[in-house]
């Protein structure tokens, strides 16, 4: 797991202004409110999405089976399992916030962000639905059948905005100066 955390730190630090160390992801792994999914490349041919832990903090063995997807890897790229990107969800009672999502820079623009987001959101929605079915009354099940995913993105991040719209997110508001002076956040939602 340490190797994976090192890769997450590397990907985070090449994508975000605020630099972090191992402790950043280690603490998330311990927190019950966070869910982390990674997009892996295996042998330059197959990619798969894997949830790093279940609610007990143990690695989730049930969601890591290879899922074949068409990839855009060249034959000369690394032929070993490595992390291409990750997504961090933060669960609340009413919704799930996409806390952070990043793809390693050299793999951006190839559709991996879309695969990571759609696969992980689908799996998380399925897990939440199963939990609701086990824990709620019949009335509560019908009242809360929708999963809401929320995210915020810098309005200047055109590539990310395009991806989020493509996978069904809708703009619901703007937070002025959220990232600093003249750096506004677009708040987006997707119901699953």
What residue ranges belong to the model's regions?
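Acetyl-CoA-dependent GNAT
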Residues: 3-68, 74-106, 114-119, 123, ...
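Conserved GNAT acetyl-CoA-binding A-motif
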Residues: 124-135, 143-152
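C-terminal "cap" of GNAT-fold acetyltransferases
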Residues: 147-150, 154-161, 167, 173-192
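Conserved glycine-rich acetyl-CoA-binding loop
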Residues: 104-118, 154-162, 166-167
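Short gly/ser/thr-rich secondary-structure transition/capping motifs
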Residues: 19, 170-171
């Amino acid at each position: 797991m340490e190797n994976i955390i090192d890769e997450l730190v590397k990907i985070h630090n090449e994508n975000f202004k605020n630099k972090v160390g191992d402790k950043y992801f280690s603490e998330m792994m311990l927190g019950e409110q966070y869910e982390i999914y990674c997009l892996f490349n295996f042998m330059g041919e197959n990619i798969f999405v894997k949830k790093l832990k279940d609610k007990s903090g143990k690695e989730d063995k049930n969601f890591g089976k290879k899922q074949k997807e068409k990839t855009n890897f060249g034959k000369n790229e690394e032929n070993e399992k490595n992390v291409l990107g990750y997504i961090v969800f933060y669960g609340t009672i009413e919704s799930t916030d996409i806390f952070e999502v990043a793809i390693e820079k050299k793999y951006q623009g190839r559709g991996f962000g879309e695969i990571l987001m759609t696969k992980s959101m689908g799996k998380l929605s399925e897990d939440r639905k199963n939990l609701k079915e086990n824990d709620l009354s019949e009335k509560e099940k019908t009242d809360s059948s929708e999963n809401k995913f929320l995210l915020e993105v810098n309005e200047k991040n055109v590539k990310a905005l395009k991806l989020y719209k493509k996978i069904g997110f809708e703009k619901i508001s703007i937070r002025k100066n959220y990232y600093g002076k003249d750096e506004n956040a677009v708040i987006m939602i997707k119901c699953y």
